Structure formats: C-alpha cells, structure tokens
Amino acid sequence: MLKTNTVFYFDSSDFINISHHYIDQANFSLAEKAIKMGLDQHPNNIDLMLLNSELLIFNSSYKDAYKILNFVEEIDPENREVYLQKATIYSKNNLSEEAIDILKRALTFIDDKLEIWNMIAMEFLLLEDFESAIPFFKKCLDFDNEDYQSLYNLIFCYENLGMIDESISELSSVLEKRPYSKIAWHQIGKIYNKQGKIKKAISAFDFAIISDDQFVSAYIEKAKVLEKIGRITEALENFRLSIELSEPNSY
C-alpha cells in the first residue's frame, strides 16, 4: 500500500501499528507516509497527531511539532506525551530550565512518574546543577534499585559536590538490598581507591568479581590498584583476565 500509493481504509490503530513498525525499522519516510495517510482518514486521532509531532522532532522541525502539541493540549490538557515531547523540544534547543518546568507540571497529574523524574534529573545534570539533580535520581533508585544508570549519575553528582561520605552511604544502602550488586561494589571500590583505602578497594573489587566473574571493569580496576602498590604479578594476572574476557569468543 505505502510503496504503491494504493489507498485502503484502515482503522486508526492499524495506521499506528504500521507507523510504529517503520519507526522501529528506522524507515522514517514510510512512517511519515503511513501517518499522513492515517491522518487523512482519521484527522482527529490524537495518537496519530503525536506520532506526527514525534517524527517532526526527530527531523528537527520543532516549530511544526510544537504547533501540533499545542493543538493536542487544547483537546487533552493532561496528555502525558504532549508534556514529554515539549520537554524534548526545549532540551534539544538547550532550554533545560523550560524543560524542567514543563516536566514538573506533568508530575502534578501523571501517575507513572519514573521517566519524568529521570528526565528532570538529566536536565539538571546538563545545567551542572548537581544538587538539584540528586533528589530526582534518588527517586528513580527508590522506585527501582536495579536502575544502575541512575546510580552512576547519582554518584557522579555526589563526586562533583565532594560528597564522598554520601556516595559511600548510598552505595552501602544499595548493597544492603542487593549484596551481589556488582555495580555498587565496583563503584565503592573506586571511591576507596581514591581515598587511599587500598585493602577496602581490593576487597570491593573482589566482591564485584564474585558477583559476576565476567565483569571486566572489576578486573581492570583491581589490577590498577595492585600495580600501584607494587603487586605486579597479581596486577598482570588481572589485566590478563580482563583481556581474555574482552575477546569476542570468551565465555
């Protein structure tokens, strides 16, 4: 149909599914065509309008996308996607404060807040406002203690603020809930190393390796510490293991 320009009537959900299919395949020209045909048949369908604005944002046509989003907002003032897309437009135009404002507005009526917390935190990170980012990354971690990207970002914020004790406390809290968290052991090991607490650092990297014996970064960090204190043979062995595990056919 899309390749021959033959037009058939489809339900709006069919056009939405077809559009998502082509977007997932990164075939945006056919996705645009499907959305246009869908809107020709279902001009008032909000989901198709939002797919259209999403593609316009992808193509950097921000003004056109914003017009659509304003129109949808008039029809559906509490549409979650409208707020997320508007925030994306602001962010892409280096207007992080405006993005944060609109995301905070969305928090007042949206039940599923996780994505919004993360988006707000990332905008604060772009502004290098680490102190403001911290509570939102903490909310993400409280919701999902396996959200390691938020954990990395939270520790990054603490380190930039010189809040080392808070970093250790946060990682220790994660380890209380998940004692085999290789990421938490790895991160706390790096902190101990920076503090010159060599024995604690090595122990932490050992626990990271116990948690996952394929965890290359733990072997590398442990090797660096061992090299620093002159335990060269052990350092070389850990470097060797990290190289071996990094090879394509390693198991």
Where are these regions (language model features)?
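Start-of-helix register in tetratricopeptide repeats
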Residues: 13, 47, 81, 115, ...
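Register position in tetratricopeptide repeats
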Residues: 24, 58, 92-93, 126-127, ...
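Canonical positions in the second alpha-helix
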Residues: 38, 71-72, 105-106, 139-140, ...
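Structural marker of alpha-solenoid helical repeat scaffolds
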Residues: 41, 74-76, 108-110, 143, ...
